[in-house]
């Protein structure tokens, strides 16, 4: 249901800050010279409601039609998320100016990368710096130069009819009109030369190379387009975990795609480093920490000729546990494709730790009980903690779900109706469960 939920607005971005970024001379006056941009597109019905389609006819920036914004005549920072259902955006400015990319999905690059165009695929994030110094009283447009996209890249197609037809297909269009005003006090007017020293993963330290495939399959039911796009020759099954990854494993994932279409591949749990795309090292803007990588469509092909598959390799360290109850996922970040089954699951196991703790009892108490405000949880064994907490009512209906909860200030249950409830705790180390009953009065 991802396409439907994103269409209706359940999608956005989170800004994560740290001491290294805070020490840099970067714009950070939120809404003045530090501006988040969520890019998407929508189709409107005759009653001006969103319709659920892969491509909309109208560009929306921060959910605004024909968006414009006033920025100061200095260096301006845009934190950009491609939140579209499917479309990629070939970003550039109407006057051809350069802009500097300073982050990829997972954080700062070693140094700003100056470009005039950048293709941002579904789910990807970048931050850019644009120098507007000395330009007060002028204006410029941030545009999508999608007429330049290949026909097998989302947004580069030109469908005249059918479910994928849309006004913006294979066209250039405005994303944001910028009116440049006066410079602010304490303005940033220069772009730093260096940002951080990333320590990337070394392929020589990889424990394994996992080989994944992307392919097309025709004739499957409930598929909107002519092809179903599938991972590892199967559609998603929520009860099946494809891989068991040992905790702290460093792994190379090698994805070979015979699909005619390009797919932004996303993995949960980790940030990774791209090793190569079709044998070529990543560009400087892609050489940092990533969690989305574009897998190009195959090249060539035709009657009797399958074409040449594309091959993308990345390396990641899996340092966070995930059991079969809460597996991590990997999928195409085009929502329609993942909804139709282009997705898989994996667990990250720590067998030794689980075996050592398997017979450890979970002794826990709840207080005050009854309660009408907050419920506090105390583990008798100080080495134990909560991995997951679920609260259900007497009919078995889930009322509260708390992954890795902070318990110091208690759990707010004031919104629950009076009655009896069951609280189930999954212990963090052993992954064993215990259930306690409490009363809301």
Where are the regions that the model predicts?
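Extended terminal and domain-junction accessory segments
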Residues: 4-40, 110-262, 269, 274, ...
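C-terminal soluble interaction/assembly domains
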Residues: 274-299, 304-307, 314-317
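C-terminal outer-membrane/trafficking sorting elements
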Residues: 355-367, 371-441
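Beta-strand-rich interaction surfaces with strong enrichment in secreted/lumenal proteins
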Residues: 66-68, 114-118, 240-243, 290-305
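Short solvent-exposed strand-capping/beta-turn motif centered on an Asx-Ser/Thr pair
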Residues: 81-86, 217, 256-260, 380-384
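Short coil/turn motif common to extracellular beta-sandwich-like domains
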Residues: 72-75, 247-250, 369-376
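Acidic-aromatic/histidine active-site loop/patch
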Residues: 30-75, 79-85
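A glycine-anchored, Pro-Gly-centered beta-turn/N-cap motif
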Residues: 74, 249, 326, 331, ...
């Amino acid at each position: 249901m991802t396409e439907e939920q994103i269409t209706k607005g359940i999608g956005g971005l989170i800004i994560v800050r740290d001491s290294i970024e805070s020490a840099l001379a970067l714009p950070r006056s939120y809404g003045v010279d530090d501006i988040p941009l969520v890019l998407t597109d929508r189709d409107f019905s005759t009653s001006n409601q969103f319709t659920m389609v892969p491509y909309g006819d109208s560009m929306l920036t921060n959910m605004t039609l024909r968006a414009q914004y006033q920025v100061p005549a200095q260096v301006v920072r845009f934190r950009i998320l491609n939140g579209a259902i499917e479309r990629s955006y070939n970003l550039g400015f109407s006057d051809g100016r350069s802009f500097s990319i300073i982050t990829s999905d997972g954080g700062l690059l070693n140094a700003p990368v100056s470009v005039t165009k950048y293709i941002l695929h579904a789910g990807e994030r970048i931050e850019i710096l644009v120098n507007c110094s000395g330009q007060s009283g002028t204006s410029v447009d941030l545009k999508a130069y999608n007429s330049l996209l290949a026909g097998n890249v989302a947004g580069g197609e030109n469908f005249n009819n059918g479910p994928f037809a849309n006004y913006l297909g294979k066209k250039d269009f405005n994303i944001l009109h910028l009116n440049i005003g006066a410079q602010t006090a304490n303005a940033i007017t220069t772009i730093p030369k260096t940002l951080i020293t990333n320590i990337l993963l070394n392929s020589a330290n990889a424990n394994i190379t996992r080989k994944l495939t992307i392919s097309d399959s025709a004739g499957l039911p409930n598929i909107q387009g002519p092809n179903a796009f599938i991972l590892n020759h199967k559609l998603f099954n929520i009860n099946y975990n494809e891989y068991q990854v040992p905790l702290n494993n460093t792994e190379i994932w090698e994805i070979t795609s015979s699909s005619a279409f390009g797919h932004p591949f996303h993995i949960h749990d980790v940030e990774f480093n791209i090793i190569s795309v079709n044998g070529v090292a990543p560009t400087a803007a892609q050489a940092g920490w990533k969690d989305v990588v574009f897998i190009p469509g195959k090249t060539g092909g035709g009657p009797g000729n399958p074409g040449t598959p594309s091959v993308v390799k990345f390396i990641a360290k899996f340092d966070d546990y995930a059991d079969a109850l809460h597996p991590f996922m990997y999928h195409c970040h085009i929502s329609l494709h993942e909804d139709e089954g282009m997705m898989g699951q994996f667990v990250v196991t720590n067998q030794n730790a689980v075996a050592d703790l398997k017979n450890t009892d979970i002794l826990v108490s709840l207080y005050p009980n009854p309660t009408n405000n907050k419920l506090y949880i105390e583990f008798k064994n100080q080495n134990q903690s909560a991995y997951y907490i679920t609260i259900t009512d007497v009919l078995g209906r889930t009322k509260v779900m708390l992954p890795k909860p902070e318990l110091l200030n208690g759990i707010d249950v004031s919104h629950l109706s009076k009655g009896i409830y069951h609280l189930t705790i999954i212990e963090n180390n052993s992954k064993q469960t215990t259930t306690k009953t409490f009363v809301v009065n």
